[in-house]
Amino acid sequence: MGPLVEATEFSKEQALTDAAENLLKPHFSTDATLSLLEVMESLLATVEQDLSSSVQKALHPPMRALVSADLLRNPDSDVRVSVVSCLTEIMRITAPEAPYNDEQMKDIFQVTIEAFEKLADASSRSYRKAEVILETVAKVRSSLVMLDLECDDLVLEMFQRFLKIIRPDHPQLVLVSMETIMITVIDESEEVPMDLLEILLTTVKKDSQDVSPAALTLVEKVLSSCTCKLQPCIMEALKSSGTSLDMYSPVVSSICQSEFATTQAHNDVKPKDNEADEKISEGQVVPSDSLEDKLNLGLSRKGTRSKRSARGGTRRANGDEKVITANEGLSESTDAETASGSTRKRGWKPKSLMNPEEGYSFKTSSSKKVQEKELGDSSLGKVAAKKVPLPSKVGQTNQSVVISLSSSGRARTGSRKRSRTKMEETDHDVSSVATQPAKKQTVKKTNPAKEDLTKSNVKKHEDGIKTGKSSKKEKADNGLAKTSAKKPLAETMMVKPSGKKLVHSDAKKKNSEGASMDTPIPQSSKSKKKDSRATTPATKKSEQAPKSHPKMKRIAGEEVESNTNELGEELVGKRVNVWWPLDKKFYEGVIKSYCRVKKMHQVTYSDGDVEELNLKKERFKIIEDKSSASEDKEDDLLESTPLSAFIQREKSKKRKIVSKNVEPSSSPEVRSSMQTMKKKDSVTDSIKQTKRTKGALKAVSNEPESTTGKNLKSLKKLNGEPDKTRGRTGKKQKVTQAMHRKIEKDCDEQEDLETKDEEDSLKLGKESDAEPDRMEDHQELPENHNVETKTDGEEQEAAKEPTAESKTNGEEPNAEPETDGKEHKSLKEPNAEPKSDGEEQEAAKEPNAELKTDGENQEAAKELTAERKTDEEEHKVADEVEQKSQKETNVEPEAEGEEQKSVEEPNAEPKTKVEEKESAKEQTADTKLIEKEDMSKTKGEEIDKETYSSIPETGKVGNEAEEDDQRVIKELEEESDKAEVSTTVLEVDP
């Protein structure tokens, strides 16, 4: 069987070559030429699309011979018809690629349209050939190439010839082929030109005299099939001409009235009414049985049909595809004409990508303009791999594949764009075709009867060409996004559930065999949103509520629509949510304007997309702007709320912050910090009580007998009696315990005054680290208080140590704590004397000199030694103090921060030059005594004895003053015994 096939192929190749050579020879007889053309036509009819390299090579000479001037421009019409018959076979073989360049294709189409004239006379010699030509043009959809080549005049001429030559006695195949060609051209045009529309309307006009019934029937079928496309054009034409619907055939009235019926159906949301409207608008179609009889949609032996590549209105270069040319040198070219992606300027051209099974691509041989001067096997070698066989004429009865009436619909349902959307990128090199807003208002709707016919005959093929519709994606670039969010992935309405790839038309899927179009090209977000609104036939069947509205094909929801009476200028400026059926979601936009003539609203979506919609036919929601109302309410609330309420609210928030940072935690650090705070508060209260005590003792300190108190103080320091110390401590603890009850109240007062922020809480954490040091300080504080709260000893100490006291008085105005950070100093120094750390320790150690360590006793001894050396100077100072104390008795305290200063001022001696020198001497003496550590105990005992003896000399006071001092000392001793227990508890308290 193998050798026989090879022999057959070889003989076919040889026959094609011989026939081409014979045609190129000059012939003096028309009959001889016709005979050679008959042989050529029969040979070409046996060639399938799946070409071998040898057949491709053998096909080249016939292609060159058929476009020669002697044959294509032969004076005999029968010869020209025979040539066209051969050329249509070549177009079938090379589909979806155009076999010649643009100029040659235009010449071929011109001759083809002339050949249709032979259909007017059934008795003519070329009538049968004309029928075959018409059938082939319809099935391979070569009329789309005419649109791509901008052959507008040829299209108009073809329509006129069809209406002129059609006869009632024509076979149904002729009528259906004419109808198919006309519907294909209208549906695939971006905008139906007025000249073409005028031809159709003139035919269906009632007063037309020269229109045959067959032509009227043909036009009515075309109008009914293209209702969605022609409806707005017809309405506009009638308005511009001012003619009435009564002047035209009832089909025109039904087309125009279907718009109102559709509007009512959408507004009422009644699916049954929508179905009825669909029947009205699309019911006038050719009976399906006649189509099945005359159009056999059987598949070829390979189960595939001829296909065409997607072009989208612009020609592109494809280096992998070789197109056979027959221009004397048989040129092979790439797309040098529109390499820059320039688009055609005409407004009438194929609307979209076409389905490859249904005929030619928009790509023609003119896109390949590089002349081929060498013929090689490669000139035809790559064509066969890309062609899907169409049936040959050998034994062709019901095997011929004729283009279905739904082919244009299938092309639209695939990757072709909707009529009211802009052409977007759908392939590597395809440029977008700019369309006017007026061109974006309708979408093709496939006739249901034809759709059923198509699916019944090519069911297997349909299973593989479900085309996907991608859903709208919101913009994620340019930082807008305002959305950040976030973006829905592209949905597809395919049989396969995958929703992440954009599936183009079957043209691209089949062209991917050996070509570079096997990878889906992602579309822009705008094209995805717009494509998602196009409804495929499969989608229509899946919808529960089919609608006849040709423009939107929206799914009617159950929600309440807006009042149709208010869908005018009242909506301008309002924000709306518009329903997109394939995305199954609403998209937000703003109504920018309203056209009274078109009754269309211009909606600008949040992603920048602009669309003109008839909102009476749309499903949408008006978005109420509640933000302004809420803002006004908030402003009113702010204005009506008093300032005190906000302050109180802020305080409560800060309290909560402090409680969150302290209370929930049970760690030792937090507990210790809380104890530190409580102790700090108790010490603060003790400070206040000390001030009150000093105020009560002010009268005593103002007496001239203050020197007696000074002597008593020195005596207490020398003796260092523990009992007296404990008595003073017990008295102080008594006051402290009384003030503990007010801790919580004082804490609240401190919060209100200080309004601590988060930094204070952090400081509190840091203070907890230094808790051990503070604990020691707090344990020593009661003794410190005792030193400071001695009845009048503190005030009289200035007479004994004038330099130190004067220095203290000079610094006292700044003694009050200024910041929280300095608060711990004020706690250590109840009288707020700004002493250094060393001075604080010395002040705390002085009352308990004998109870401290040996080193502390040495320091106390050294200090007393320094006092002894300046004993004579102290006598002088004491006299001066007595004189000035009487003058300063009536001095009132100036401020709370200076209260301590006013208490000590009566006994204080202002610093003079002599005192400054004495202070310097005293400091020098102290420094020297510190270095003498070996004299600690011995000198201390001697100093004690000498001090006892010196008391009578310096303690010359009245009897009344001595009695008062003794009474105070006695009271302190009694209280010391009672407070001994509480003192022990305070020292042990953690």
UniProtKB/Swiss-Prot annotation:
Residues 302-314, 727-742 have a biased composition (Basic residues). HEAT repeats lie at residues 31-57, 58-96, 153-190, 191-228, 232-269. CDD domains: Tudor_Agenet_AtEML-like (cd20404). A motif (Nuclear localization signal 4) lies at residues 677-684. Pfam families: PDS5. A motif (Nuclear localization signal 5) lies at residues 715-722. SUPFAM superfamilies: ARM repeat, Tudor/PWWP/MBT. Residues 262-565, 653-966 are annotated as: Disordered. A motif (Nuclear localization signal 1) lies at residues 458-465. Residues 662-673 have a biased composition (Low complexity). Disruption phenotype: Weak impact on meiosis such as formation of some chromosome bridges at late anaphase I and telophase I in forming pollen, but severe effects on development, fertility, somatic homologous recombination (HR) and DNA repair, especially in plants lacking PDS5A, PDS5B, PDS5C, PDS5D and PDS5E. GO terms for cellular component: nucleus; plasmodesma. GO terms for biological process: cell division; DNA recombination; DNA repair; homologous recombination; microsporogenesis; mitotic sister chromatid cohesion. Its main location: nucleus. Coiled coil: none annotated. Residues 267-281, 421-430, 448-477, 503-512, 761-810, 819-890, 898-947 have a biased composition (Basic and acidic residues). Residues 746-760 have a biased composition (Acidic residues). A motif (Nuclear localization signal 2) lies at residues 539-546. A motif (Nuclear localization signal 3) lies at residues 583-590. Residues 328-342, 394-410 have a biased composition (Polar residues). It is found in: Nucleus. Keywords: Cell cycle, Cell division, DNA damage, DNA repair, Mitosis, Nucleus, Repeat. InterPro entries: ARM-type_fold, Pds5. PANTHER family: ANDROGEN INDUCED INHIBITOR OF PROLIFERATION AS3 / PDS5-RELATED, SISTER CHROMATID COHESION PROTEIN PDS5 HOMOLOG E. Belongs to the PDS5 family. This is Sister chromatid cohesion protein PDS5 homolog E. The lineage of its organism: Eukaryota, Viridiplantae, Streptophyta, Embryophyta, Tracheophyta.
